[in-house]
């Protein structure tokens, strides 16, 4: 049986917003927002947090341990090796690559992408090329076999930092662009945590949505409030 595993790339280090993975949005850590939402997926077979073996990322590993979430620790300088190690640790076949600084990611979009992957003979299912979703909701799905190939063949800095980068560099790879429903096409909305102003905005959104919809509010709820 094919195993589809989400790996969440999470680091505490950030030049613009240090410690952002453990920042509270509406009283809940950023990482917890994302993990809780991904656990509501109906198509994922599991998830794992990929972080570094550096001391500064201990809070991420400690959080994962307390909450019973799988966590892989690898190189602090090689995101591709770290992502591959996490996926191999989970014995996956298909990779769903997620950034930890996207706390309000809607699992329904992930599930739609997995369904497209299952029905098509392609190397990548992505929303990232069309860029119609709010920033922080894009999904990329590809095979573990492809990730292993990239890890062996690609040593460019872009590839080692962004594991899906090689898929977009050659016409060799078969890419399917996932089209999302029109009511989700709000590309001007930024739901990524990268700066203090992002933290302030997302914190206000979290508080407003929590009051109306509860802590696991979805994208529809966010758009209604925004």
Model-derived features with residue positions:
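Short, well-formed alpha-helical segments that are part of the catalytic scaffolds
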Residues: 17-40
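Conserved nucleotide-sugar donor-binding
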Residues: 92-93, 139-151, 196-200
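Short aromatic-hydrophobic micro-motifs that form the base-stacking/packing surface
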Residues: 94-98
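Conserved donor-nucleotide/metal-binding helix-loop-beta segment in metal-dependent transferases, i.e.
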Residues: 106-132
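Acidic donor-binding/catalytic loop of UDP-sugar-dependent glycosyltransferases
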Residues: 79-84, 99-116
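Conserved N-terminal catalytic core of the sugar/cofactor nucleotidyltransferase
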Residues: 32-93
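Conserved alpha/beta core of the MobA/IspD/sugar-nucleotide pyrophosphorylase nucleotidyltransferase superfamily
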Residues: 142, 163-226
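N-terminal nucleotide-binding beta1-loop-alpha1 segment
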Residues: 1-17
